[in-house]
């Protein structure tokens, strides 16, 4: 009898040791994605009811976690104890430690990006840390080490709980009956309330068990399916997109300025993407402290209302080149495709096309290069390949790589000109990546000062590039796009700037300059929001190249109809990223928060948001926002499927680029 009692005490302690951190993880996660725990969770779970807060938690939020832990313990017992014959104490303590490690890793991900881990972002994180091991030291703070020590101590909970129960039983033998009674109550609660919460709630994302959510997230690799039996035609895709993107329909085309056809001729095109460049910290336009950018802005199309199409570099580049939103699903595009992107179209007009990465293109494996091949770039270089591995101080090395990338871009343009051809070059800069550069005269500088120093370094590189063009007689023969790929993404970036982690301008609003002295004798400032998807059609129109018959979801940025168009800001559409999808229409940004099924709205460029239910005077209701987000995602998925079919079933044979 004593052995059975000891086992029951140990099982009870094991369950408690698994349940408590699970609930901590669950509430930490929901707090991160919903806001204030004491008010938001209760409203989200049973909006519009008068139920007491404690009942909302007991009935809707935690039951599925009791059930998750019950199934977890049962599975561990069956596999570890029955099949593998692992000693119960070792199995219990080892599983608790494993749970704490796995849950802690997910909490770090939630803290940094607002989402749990997926296989993709585990691989990305692993590869990035391998390239930047210094990041590990930044995470090993005294607070985190204290939490690690607490976790190690907690692993002994099953043993300590069983020992405490034995002592209690020795003093009060009748107390042992409490264990089976409590077990029966927990089992009943888990099966009845847990199943109802997880499967019977319309808000199952909140009610679902934490570990169920983790498994679902980890197995989510690519939510979209580009291989479909039925794929809309190009005209059907455009019609569907216009229906969702232009809520009031489209008027006749009119333009901010009219550029005569005599000036819309082929020019050398260079696109520079600035890594992690929120407009708030990269005010490039009309900034006298950045003389090169200031001079460029005087003869350019500029905007303070430009938005990235995704908070990921490779997806942002996809949109810039193709003129379409990136496909929902994994942020790593694994399938092959063929688009009407700039590299393909300009190659067909005699351009020499190339892509230059200012770091190491292969740090995350071969898929980034394959993506660029499918985007139509036959020539791909990276600065590490050209300059070699690090041999100097880290910041000097980064600046050296950037300088090498700019010089290589200049050589491509000059070389094409000498062959009486035009060049299309994309330069993906890396200098703005966190951890920010340190000014050499101030090793202890604030994060804004460090970003300002980065902008000044970039300004000198652009001055060097422009001088090189002028020396070769090409100063007026270029169209240069300077654009941020995306804004901030990780909590460490926000914290370094003493900024709250908010899904909005700091993530998506980026600088934009389209410098072309042969096209813009004066500055042209756009008053309405634009997107990365507008770059490709705008470039083609400015070069006088017809784009009829090609599929673009973007529009010429000079077209005033864009004032009535929705600009989409997707994130939850991509697995492992912040769980909200937004769009801007007019002066409002509407956000659908996936996990908590809540719609918020905020004024463009404002930080505070409010529930859309509290703004009944606005043109969109919660149902409208959900419908728009869902319809847009469907269009983006269908567009990806259309491009996939082009690759595998091109007229007359395979469209393979290999």
What annotation goes with each model-predicted range?
Residues 57-63, 329-333, 393-397, 448-452, ...:
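Active-site rim elements
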Residues 443-461:
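Active-site-proximal segments of metal-dependent phosphoesterases and phosphodiesterases across multiple
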Residues 303, 314-323, 497-548:
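Substrate-binding rim/cap in mid-to-C-terminal beta-strand-loop elements of soluble/periplasmic
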Residues 6-13, 87-89, 162-167, 180-185, ...:
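Membrane-interface soluble catalytic domains
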Residues 188-271, 276-443, 453, 543, ...:
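Active-site-proximal alpha/beta segments of enzymes that process anionic O-linked groups
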């Amino acid at each position: 009898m004593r052995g059975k009692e000891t086992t029951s005490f140990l099982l009870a302690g094991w369950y408690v040791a698994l349940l408590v951190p699970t609930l901590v993880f669950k509430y930490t996660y929901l707090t991160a994605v919903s806001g204030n725990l004491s008010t938001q969770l209760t409203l989200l779970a049973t909006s519009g009811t008068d139920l007491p807060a404690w009942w909302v938690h007991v009935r809707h939020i935690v039951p599925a976690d009791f059930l998750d832990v019950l199934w977890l313990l049962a599975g561990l017992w069956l596999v570890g104890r029955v099949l593998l014959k692992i000693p119960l104490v070792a199995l219990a303590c080892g599983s608790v430690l494993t749970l704490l490690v796995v849950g802690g890793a997910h909490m770090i991900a939630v803290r940094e990006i607002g989402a749990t881990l997926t296989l993709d972002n585990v691989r990305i994180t692993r590869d990035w840390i391998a390239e930047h091991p210094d990041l590990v030291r930044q995470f090993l703070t005294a607070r985190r080490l204290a939490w690690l020590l607490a976790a190690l101590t907690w692993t002994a909970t099953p043993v300590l709980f069983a020992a405490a129960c034995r002592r209690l039983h020795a003093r009060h033998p009748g107390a042992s009956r409490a264990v089976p009674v409590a077990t029966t109550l927990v089992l009943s609660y888990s099966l009845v309330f847990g199943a109802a919460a997880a499967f019977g709630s319309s808000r199952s994302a909140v009610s679902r068990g934490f570990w169920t959510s983790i498994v679902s997230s980890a197995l989510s690799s690519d939510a979209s399916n580009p291989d479909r039996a039925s794929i809309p035609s190009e005209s059907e895709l455009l019609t569907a997109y216009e229906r969702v993107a232009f809520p009031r329909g489209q008027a006749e085309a009119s333009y901010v300025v009219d550029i005569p056809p005599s000036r819309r001729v082929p020019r050398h095109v260079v696109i520079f993407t600035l890594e992690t460049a929120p407009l708030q910290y990269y005010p490039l336009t009309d900034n006298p402290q950045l003389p090169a950018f200031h001079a460029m802005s005087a003869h350019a199309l500029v905007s303070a209302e430009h938005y990235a199409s995704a908070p990921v570099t490779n997806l942002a580049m996809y949109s810039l080149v193709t003129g379409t939103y990136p496909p929902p699903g994994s942020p790593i595009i694994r399938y092959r495709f063929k688009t009407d992107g700039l590299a393909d179209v300009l190659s067909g007009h005699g351009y020499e096309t190339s892509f230059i990465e200012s770091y190491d293109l292969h740090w995350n494996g071969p898929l980034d290069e394959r993506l660029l091949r499918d985007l139509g770039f036959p020539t791909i270089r990276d600065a590490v390949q050209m300059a070699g591995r690090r041999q100097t101080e880290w910041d000097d090395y980064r600046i050296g790589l950037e300088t090498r990338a700019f010089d290589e871009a200049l050589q491509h343009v000059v070389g094409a000109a000498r062959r009486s051809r035009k060049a299309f070059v994309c330069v993906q800069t890396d200098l703005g990546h966190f951890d920010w550069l340190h000014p050499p005269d101030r090793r202890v500088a604030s994060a804004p000062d460090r970003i300002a120093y980065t902008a000044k370094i970039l300004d000198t590189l652009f001055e060097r590039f422009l001088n090189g063009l002028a020396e070769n007689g090409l100063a007026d023969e270029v169209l240069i796009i300077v654009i941020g790929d995306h804004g901030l993404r990780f909590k460490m970036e926000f914290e370094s700037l003493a900024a709250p982690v908010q899904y909005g301008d700091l993530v998506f609003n980026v600088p934009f300059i389209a410098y072309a002295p042969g096209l813009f004798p004066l500055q042209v400032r756009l008053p309405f929001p634009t997107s990365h998807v507008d770059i490709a059609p705008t470039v083609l129109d400015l070069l006088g190249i017809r784009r009829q018959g090609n599929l673009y979801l973007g529009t010429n940025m000079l077209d005033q109809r864009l004032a009535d168009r929705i600009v989409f800001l997707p994130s939850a559409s991509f697995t492992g990223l912040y769980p909200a999808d937004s769009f801007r229409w007019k002066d409002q940004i509407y956000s659908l928060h996936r996990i908590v099924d809540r719609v918020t709205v905020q004024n463009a460029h404002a930080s505070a948001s409010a529930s859309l239910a509290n703004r009944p005077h606005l043109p969109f209701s919660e149902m409208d926002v959900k419908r728009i987000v869902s319809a847009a995602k469907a269009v983006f998925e269908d567009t990806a499927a259309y491009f996939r079919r082009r690759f595998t079933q091109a007229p007359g044979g395979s469209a393979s680029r290999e």
